[in-house]
């Protein structure tokens, strides 16, 4: 990264001291790029099984195409220019350099500007939100958003924690401090994957400051009510608060939930137990890293992509976008520290944590995308989220909606905020 001098940014009349505004030109290092190409050139490919698609993981035949594009066509300098499209900042919080993007609407006029923090997850990064940013910062019938997008410590340009125990509660505490430094007394939150847990924790910690919480991933809680609805739901859905769409997405339950999770959660067990072991190989091999990360962008976008030779990757994403995300992990060497976040949150029983036993009372909006890893009906979400003002069955999309379906996600965030603002 290339830093300017230390400076004070005026935000809402408040002077905020930062370590510096920076650009990403420092990522364009000829020696680093030469090293990347040398490592790519030394890749040892293996042959996939016949007609295996992505059922065994990233298909090696298609991987050769991706790697060839990466080596011969992908223009990292051009993508760094794209990264620099929005202003980047760093500030030190609790001893860690925390990276974030801060984008204000271009034309304020008479419009109401609502502060919004959006938080990514794994294997994503701040770059996930680049397509949705211009949609949220434009005027929507008098409403627009001033957007803050931080990188979770240990991801991308944020410094990695140096001590054990940095979990979602710690990240939530740091991001609350960030919004306070930026001068926002109240604000909206949006998140998916780890971002949904972090923003939920923020709403639990400071409900007085969180005007609204919007999630595109919601994990259900356990208990008798959930168990009973699983038993009765397929036959008498109205008795347990299920809609027809809930039934379609949930059942048969074992096939769509238990079996699917068994097929797709192997990575989770590794990262929640021994992240440094697997991460060591990924941090050393760019092609291994790309295969590991991009396989998730295939399967988590649509489960049927497992049956395709190319994993359906280019149906929703461009190789430039996918490889830019990979390069953020590669150039910052952050794959191991990002994987550790699983162990910090799942290394012990998450149901024993205080946040698992604490309700969420701020206005909440849920966008239920049909290809999300697990479907959470409104009746299940209400067990924890006590003030759901918006629940939308999204027509299409999976785990990465800001990158897959930015218009759909933006529209739902906007309508949710308008409901909360009573516009």
Role assignments for model-derived ranges:
Residues 33-106, 111, 330-352:
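Non-catalytic accessory segments flanking enzyme active sites
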Residues 94, 148, 152-192, 220:
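Active-site loop/oxyanion-hole signature of alpha/beta-hydrolase fold enzymes
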Residues 135-144, 182-241:
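Conserved hydrolase catalytic core segment
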Residues 20-21, 25, 31-34, 40, ...:
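Alpha/beta-hydrolase
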Residues 112-121:
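Short beta-strand element of the alpha/beta-hydrolase
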């Amino acid at each position: 990264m290339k830093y300017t001098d230390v400076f004070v940014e005026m935000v809402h009349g408040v002077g905020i001291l930062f370590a510096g505004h920076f650009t990403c030109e420092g990522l364009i290092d000829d020696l680093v790029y030469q090293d990347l190409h040398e490592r790519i050139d030394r890749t040892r490919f293996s042959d996939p099984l016949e007609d295996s698609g992505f059922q065994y993981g990233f298909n090696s035949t298609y991987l050769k195409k991706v790697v060839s594009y990466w080596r011969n066509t992908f223009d990292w300098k051009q993508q760094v220019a794209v990264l620099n499209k929005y202003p980047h900042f760093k500030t030190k919080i609790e001893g860690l350099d925390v990276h974030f993007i801060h984008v204000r609407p271009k034309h304020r006029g008479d419009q109401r500007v609502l502060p919004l923090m959006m938080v990514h997850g794994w294997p994503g990064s701040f770059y996930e939100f680049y397509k949705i940013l211009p949609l949220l910062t434009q005027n929507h019938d008098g409403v627009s958003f001033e957007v803050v997008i931080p990188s979770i410590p240990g991801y991308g340009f944020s410094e990695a924690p140096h001590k054990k125990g940095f979990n979602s509660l710690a990240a939530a505490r740091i991001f609350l401090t960030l919004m306070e430094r930026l001068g926002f007394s109240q604000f909206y939150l949006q998140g998916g994957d780890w971002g949904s847990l972090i923003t939920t924790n923020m709403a639990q910690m400071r409900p007085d400051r969180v005007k609204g919480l919007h999630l595109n991933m919601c994990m259900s809680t356990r208990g008798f009510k959930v168990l009973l609805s699983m038993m009765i739901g397929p036959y008498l859905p109205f008795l347990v608060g299920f809609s027809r769409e809930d039934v379609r997405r949930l059942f048969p339950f074992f096939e769509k939930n238990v079996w699917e999770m068994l097929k797709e959660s192997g990575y989770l067990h590794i990262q929640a137990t021994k992240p440094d072991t697997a991460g060591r190989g990924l941090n050393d091999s760019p092609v291994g890293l790309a295969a590991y990360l991009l396989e998730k962008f295939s399967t988590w976008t649509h489960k049927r992509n497992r049956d395709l030779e190319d994993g359906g990757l280019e149906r929703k994403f461009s190789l430039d976008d996918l490889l830019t995300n990979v390069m953020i992990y590669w150039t910052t060497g952050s794959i191991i520290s990002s994987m550790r976040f699983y162990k910090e949150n799942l290394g012990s029983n998450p149901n024993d944590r205080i946040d698992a036993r604490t309700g969420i009372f701020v206005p909440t909006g849920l966008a239920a995308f049909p290809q999300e890893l697990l479907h959470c009906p409104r009746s299940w979400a209400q067990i924890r989220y006590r003030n759901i003002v918006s629940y939308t069955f999204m027509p299409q999309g999976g785990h990465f909606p800001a990158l897959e379906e930015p218009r759909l996600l933006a529209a739902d965030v906007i309508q949710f905020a308008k409901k909360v603002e009573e516009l």
